[in-house]
Structure formats: C-alpha cells, structure tokens
C-alpha cells in the first residue's frame, strides 16, 4: 500500500529531475479511493512543488460520487485530471451515468479542470481495430480532452503508425507517449494479457536471456526504455511519460541515459 509517507519519500526523489507533471493513480492510496489519490496529488503539489495529475475513473461511480471527488480535488487545488473509464472489478456494479470517459470529460471541463484522456497506440483490447478506436479517441477530444497519454508500448513503430492515423482522424490535442521498463517476465505477460501490447523481438530476447537474472533484466530493460525515449524524442513527439510503478530510480536511470545521449 502506498501511504502518504511512502508517496512523499518516493516523489521527493523525482524533484531534481524537474518533470512536467507526476501522476497520482486512482488506486495510488492502496484502494480505489479518490480521496487517497487527491491527498497524494496535494503532497506532490503543495509540499514538493511539482505539477500533479490526478487519475479519476468512473466505470462504477454515481454522479454523486464523481461530484464529491471533484469537490475534493478543487478544495485541494488540483487542476489536472486524467479522465478514465477504468475497469470493473468483481462485485462492482456498472455505472448507469458514466459508461465511458466521454461521459466524465464534460463534467471536468465544466469545473475548469485541464483534462487528459487515454490513448491506445495498438487499440483498446475491446475495440475491433485501430480505426474503430480512433473514433473513440476523437470523441474524447470533442468532449473536451486537452491532451492524451498513451497506454504503454514497447514498439515505437506501432506508435508512429498510430500517430499518423490519429492526425489523419483529426486529433490535434498533444499526445504524450507512455513508456514502462519491464521488471519481470510476469509483468510483461500481464501487460500483454490486459492491454494487448506487442513485443518486438529485441525485448523478447532480453526477457529470455535474463529470465533468471533480475538485476541484469532490470538494467537491460531500462536501457531498452531509454532507447525508446531517445528515438521518440528525435521524432519530435509531443511528450514522454515514464510509468515507474513507484520506483523513482527507474526515472533517474532513464534520465541519466537520455542526458548522456544528448552530450
């Protein structure tokens, strides 16, 4: 469980990297609790002077619950929200008011939030194909999304194909690329199962070569992620977002490799 004290200690190690923003996920406090998320976002913003982006999911939420969550965010001075549908867990009842992120985004805009939304370079697993998924992406933009953050991907070529198609579909909002270094073979298997991400041959070789050597796997994966980031930056993407899973050393090491490449 990520307590406020652990969040404070973890995030403090990112301050010297000067990130444009830091995410507080909707389950950051150890449960799907919007107050826990807003508390961590407030720590980022008020104590560490970093721009916070709070995640907010709506798939099982009532209008009253969302209104309460937005009140709490505004009271704490949080201005940036990533609007997500979220996945239902066993025992939860689907919301009748919020079926998609497009139902949540207009409420956030009415409240004056800067709103981000999710993008899927390889299409959301529930979509037939990327073309269908791009229709939903455009709907999020039309609903008021100011920017997008992508699901993680390991193959930059998948992103470049998506980027071209998104522009052709009328997407003008900035798209920030989400990159996550893999820390274990099990983690990758979960991502492939849950998100449908593809694995380039190079990352498969890394996983197989270092399956029984966690330290070497970690080092090789961070180097691979840094190569992705460098290539994306050279292609002039709108932004880069590292999914560190509360491991600040991942961001520190990736940034070190990026800076070395730019010298």
Model-identified regions with their sequence ranges:
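Acidic (Asp/Glu)-rich catalytic clusters
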Residues: 11-18, 38-49, 70-78, 106-110, ...
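Active-site pocket-lining/capping segments in soluble small-molecule metabolic enzymes
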Residues: 96-121, 169-222, 227, 258-263
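Active-site glycine-rich loop that binds ribose-phosphate moieties when present
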Residues: 126-148
């Amino acid at each position: 469980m990520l307590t406020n004290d652990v969040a404070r200690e973890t995030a403090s190690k990112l301050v010297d990297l000067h990130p444009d923003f830091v995410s507080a996920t909707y389950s950051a406090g150890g449960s799907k609790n919007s107050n826990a998320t807003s508390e961590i976002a407030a720590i980022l913003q008020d104590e560490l002077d970093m721009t916070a982006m709070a995640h907010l999911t709506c798939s099982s939420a009532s209008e009253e619950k969302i209104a309460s969550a937005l009140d709490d965010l505004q009271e704490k001075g949080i201005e940036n929200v990533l609007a997500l549908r979220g996945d239902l867990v066993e025992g939860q009842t689907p919301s009748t008011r919020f079926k998609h992120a497009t139902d949540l985004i207009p409420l956030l805009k009415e409240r004056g939030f800067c709103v981000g939304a999710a993008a899927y370079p390889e299409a959301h697993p529930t979509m037939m194909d990327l073309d269908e998924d791009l229709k939903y992406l455009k709907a999020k933009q039309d609903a008021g999304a100011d920017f997008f953050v992508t699901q993680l991907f390991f193959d930059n070529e998948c992103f470049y194909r998506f980027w071209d198609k998104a522009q052709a579909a009328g997407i003008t909002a900035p798209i920030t690329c989400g990159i996550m270094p893999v820390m274990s073979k099990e983690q990758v298997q979960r991502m492939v199962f849950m998100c449908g991400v593809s694995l380039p041959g190079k990352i498969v070789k890394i996983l197989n070569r270092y399956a029984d050597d966690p330290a070497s796997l970690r080092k090789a994966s961070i180097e691979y992620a840094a190569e992705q980031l460098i290539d994306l930056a050279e292609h002039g993407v709108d932004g880069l977002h590292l999914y560190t899973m509360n491991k600040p050393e991942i961001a520190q090491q990736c940034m070190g490799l990026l800076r070395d490449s730019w010298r």
